[in-house]
Amino acid sequence: ARGRSRADWLVGMNFSRAFTLATDEKLSVGRVQTPTLAMLVERELAIRAFVPEEYLEIRATFEGETGRYRGTWFDAATKEDGGKRLPKDGTAAAAIVARVKAGPAAIESVESKTRRVPPPLLFDLTELQRHANRLLGWSAKKTLEVAQRLYEEKKAITYPRTDSRHLSRDVAATLPRVIHALAPAWGTLFAKGTGETPLGARYVDDAKVSDHHAIVPTPTAPRDLDREEQALYDLVVRRLLAAWHGEHVAATTTVVTAVGGVPGAPGRIVDRFRSSGTMVVEAGWKAVEPEPASRKKDDDGEEAELPPGLARGQREKVVDVASVERKTRPPKRFTDATLLTAMETAGKTLDEKELADAMKENGLGTPATRAEILETLLTRGYAERTGKAFSATEKGIRLIALVPESVKSPALTGRWEAELARLQRGEGRLETFMKG
């Protein structure tokens, strides 16, 4: 830790001074701050350079003995973009619409897949910040501030500045007391065995606990929480309770409807439409942790309510068919949640395995420092936040254009973390690392 902090200080001081003198503009460079800004700048430039492309899709509504459903035309021979895009001049689309109106239609295939999702791991700080950003719209800084109040003043949650998502066996042994304290207010959300059945190795693993374990409620039932404190406490409680719930099970059905005669018949063009529908089989842990109300699938025309009983070979009537104007979308701007994830996984972009492995544990920054890094970019004018979205400013773009690749990529952090790992194993000296 001492080596890391001293080296960070030297890099920040020397590079910041050099670029400030070279440009007559006060600039700040940091081992974590600058690669994080580089990700924002790369995204900003991609958004500015983006030119939307207009295209057409064809949507049809079918009706048979089991009910109505909607589908989107696709070319099975084209893999790009699912084969759904047609030129905007409308010539090809008009020909397809005319053919489809003439029918007939029949279901060519029905495929169902079941997806089972286990309950999520407990919160470390970064995951809590991501979750609060998605559900509450909070910045990483605000989440940390409220979590600190819950920990220091209200004694309601455990230490929040943790990078672990597991519990030690000793802490897990206290969970029955925690659940007992939660029962009066939260008992309706308990699954069978909550607080009685010990959590398994997915949650309890001494080897995966660093200095501090995952964030969980304490056995102290909090009182007089303000609105913000209650909202964050609610997330922490629900995440713990979810651990005793079962998997979330959903069944996704994909139907291909062929129009234009019996599929495969010679001399006939067969147009195919894809329809998909998802049905929750078992809510499981999502009964405790529902997704944000704002989280919706993109309108790709394929996700639809499918009537039960659809089967291969069933004849369908074409009720309606039309082309729909669409356009490609620019890359999405970072939010606190997605930028925290990008920082956490930055090492995966490194080609050299040793450097990538060295960053697996922390990525860029640590859970305790990432919120501060984001706020530093904002206060120094390198980035700005509009609603939940981050964007790089002109000042930030200028800085990234000036600094060398080695400083704005995660490689510097990777090299340092590899050297510091050697120091922890007793394979080197701090003085040598500092001189290098």
Q: Regions from the language model: what does each represent?
A:
Residues 1-114, 195, 209-279, 283:
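Phosphate-backbone binding and catalysis cores of DNA-processing enzymes
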Residues 11, 47-53, 155-161, 429-432:
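Short amphipathic alpha-helical segments at helix boundaries and their inter-helical linkers
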Residues 12, 30, 284, 313, ...:
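Glycine-centered flexibility motif
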Residues 87-232, 240, 244-252, 263-265, ...:
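Structured DNA-binding interfaces in DNA transaction proteins
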Residues 411-436:
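Non-catalytic DNA-recognition/assembly elements of restriction-modification systems
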Residues 279-293:
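Short, His- and charge-rich active-site/binding loops that engage polyanionic ligands
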Residues 7-10, 146-147, 434:
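Short alpha-helical scaffolding segments that buttress acidic/His motifs in well-ordered protein cores
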Residues 22, 26, 47, 172-174, ...:
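Hydrophobic alpha-helical segments
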